[in-house]
């Protein structure tokens, strides 16, 4: 619980010391496990924690990647308890009890699971391979400094397979291995109208309201079939074959249970695709936050000077996040009326990734699941993004096994 108690929110500067504390605690755990070459590797941002246990150069080497930073917890009033005060509660899904805290699944809990596994194997003297750990503190803000670290430390990070547990599985009783991740493009739009907030009675109807304008612009980003309207957005999308689509839709999935679990009244998404397809093999564009004007309690009749929106786009194979950034920026500027000015800011992003299923690593992971669950895991594609995965394959020339244990009920990022 000690690691979960640290509010290592990488997105907020006021938590920089906490992020550092999490890195230092992780290093202590590495040393306690008797890992070798344990170190905190400095970057221009938050550090990377490294440790290894090399038994023999003749044995294969697994590189375990994870992250110790977490998402912001806002809005705090929607939490039942302090998100950084972990506790165990029995639930319908987990009658044995589950840990509740920010990061319990994403990714402190899943990452720490590997440390405990190594601990047991070292105690029993049956560690069957070499193991390296590379745990970063910036995954939730795009892994901006990990790319340079990987490029500068290829020999240190050399491996036969990369193991990542930062994804999920279908259910507690149905194991799955993630074979694909969507990419990400994260943008911010700022509109400016008048040079200050105005009296909505004196100026309403005569001055363009940036919030009204931004709302119309955002609404225009999808057509009536929920397809994204940015010119060129779908140009390089690699379509999934009908055979693969049919196989994908054989995955155990109940739409009514899906809706009930998150309080939906009706389905939503791009016409012509199932919910499973919409959340994995199709791109998506969503507003992550929108604000402007007066948003505190009570009333203040203003016509705001500015309006803001943060928008993320999930990408699929064939799309390049930097190209999508360019298309988005150009389109937003083209549809901005002359009554306001616009500023578009690029944040982080990453490429989509598809993993092969014919590797030794995949076979080993599949066998491990089968040994525990007495059934073969199902290969699935995940709608989320881990920006650095595609880079691993490019720079380290090794494949990644996305062996996650998270469940939808974990409500990560909520």
Regions found by a protein language model. Name each.
Residues 1-76, 306, 323:
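N-terminal helical capping/dimerization or prosegment-like subdomains
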Residues 57, 171-172, 229-306, 317-327, ...:
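An extended, acidic, His-containing surface patch that forms the Zn2+-binding/catalytic region
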Residues 59-132:
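Active-site metal-coordination/substrate-binding segment of hydrolases
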Residues 68-70, 134-143, 165-170, 193-195, ...:
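Acidic, glycine-rich active-site loops and adjacent beta-strand->loop/helix elements
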Residues 103-180:
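Acidic/histidine-rich catalytic neighborhood of metal-dependent amide-processing enzymes
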Residues 105, 195-197, 313-321, 350:
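A generic structural motif
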Residues 176-192, 402, 406:
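Flexible glycine/proline-rich, aromatic-decorated loop/lid segments
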Residues 204-226:
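A short core secondary-structure module
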């Amino acid at each position: 619980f000690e690691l979960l108690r640290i509010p290592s929110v990488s997105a907020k500067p006021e938590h920089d010391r906490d992020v550092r504390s999490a890195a230092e605690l992780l290093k202590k755990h590495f040393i306690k496990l008797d890992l070798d070459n344990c170190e905190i590797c400095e970057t221009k941002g938050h550090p990377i924690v490294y440790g290894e246990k090399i038994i023999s150069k003749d044995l294969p080497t697994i590189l375990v990647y994870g992250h110790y930073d977490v998402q912001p917890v806002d809005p705090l009033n929607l939490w039942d308890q302090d998100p950084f005060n972990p506790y165990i509660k029995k639930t319908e899904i987990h009658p044995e009890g589950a840990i509740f805290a920010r990061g319990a699944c994403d990714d402190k809990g899943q990452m720490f699971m590997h440390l405990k596994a190594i601990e047991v194997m070292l105690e029993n003297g049956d560690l069957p391979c070499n193991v390296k750990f590379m745990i970063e503190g910036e995954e939730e803000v795009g892994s901006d400094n990990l790319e340079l670290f990987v490029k500068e430390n290829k020999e240190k990070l050399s491996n036969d397979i990369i193991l990542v547990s930062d994804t999920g599985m279908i259910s507690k009783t149905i194991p799955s291995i993630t074979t694909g991740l969507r990419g990400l493009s994260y943008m911010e739009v700022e509109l400016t109208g008048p040079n200050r907030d105005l009296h909505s009675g004196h100026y309403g109807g005569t001055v363009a309201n940036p919030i009204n304008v931004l709302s119309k612009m955002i609404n225009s980003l999808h057509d009536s079939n929920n397809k994204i309207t940015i010119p060129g957005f779908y140009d390089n999308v690699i379509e999934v074959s009908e055979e693969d689509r049919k196989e994908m839709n054989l995955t155990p999935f109940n739409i009514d249970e899906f809706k009930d679990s998150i309080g939906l009244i009706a389905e939503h998404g791009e016409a012509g695709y199932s919910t499973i397809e919409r959340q994995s093999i199709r791109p998506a564009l969503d507003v992550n936050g929108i604000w402007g004007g007066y948003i505190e309690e009570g009333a203040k009749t203003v016509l705001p000077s500015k309006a803001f929106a943060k928008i993320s786009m999930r990408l699929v194979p064939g799309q390049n996040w930097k190209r999508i950034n360019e298309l988005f920026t150009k389109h937003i500027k083209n549809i901005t009326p002359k009554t306001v000015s616009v500023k578009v800011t690029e944040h982080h992003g990453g490429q989509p990734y598809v993993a092969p299923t014919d590797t030794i690593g995949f076979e080993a992971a599949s066998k491990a699941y089968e040994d525990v669950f007495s059934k073969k895991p199902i290969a699935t594609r995940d709608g989320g993004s881990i920006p650095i995965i595609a880079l691993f394959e490019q720079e380290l020339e090794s494949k990644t096994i996305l062996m996650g244990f998270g469940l939808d009920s974990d409500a990560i990022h909520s």
